[in-house]
Amino acid sequence: MRKLVYYVGTTLDGYIAGPGGEFDFFPLSDQMTASMNERYPETVPTHIRPHVGMGNPPNRVFDTVLMGRGSYEPARSVGVSSPYAHLRQYVVSTTLPDIDDPAVNLVRTDPSAKIQELKTEEGQDIWLCGGGILAGELLPEIDELIVKRYPVIAGAGIPMIAGTFEPILFTPTANEVFDNGASVTWLKRNS
């Protein structure tokens, strides 16, 4: 069965973006970018690939992406309606007008039911791209986490997971530290 994997970058205090959705304050490094792009090339948006010297590598882990409106809007705001054309794309939103691109599927209700349906299909894993509100709604469905933790404190912003108090244990399976002080931790949900 396919897994839902929340692959996300966060501050030390648990924010994936600033209050206005900004994320340009994360300290990036060539070492970290190269490592993560090698492992997960499908997470690089299609329109960005030529600018980072990436051709069209095969999808290694994911063949489907699910994102909330806030994660979809940055591409849409620059005229890109299909940011991950190399993946099956689902955008969860109750407020977004219809999407004029047949490659992007709009999910207006019950994202959990959509994930349960997608998990039964053949294929690679499903990448939960964000955001925090959607991750909170889908927390019971999240099987694995890949958390890029950057050495910065934001103080406020969009939390990694917004929801109700519902502790769920995950077990770390690997951790890697990079030259910019950031780390990536891979975690699996406890049974």
Model-based region annotation:
Residues M1-S191:
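Enzymes that bind and transform nitrogen-containing heteroaromatic metabolites
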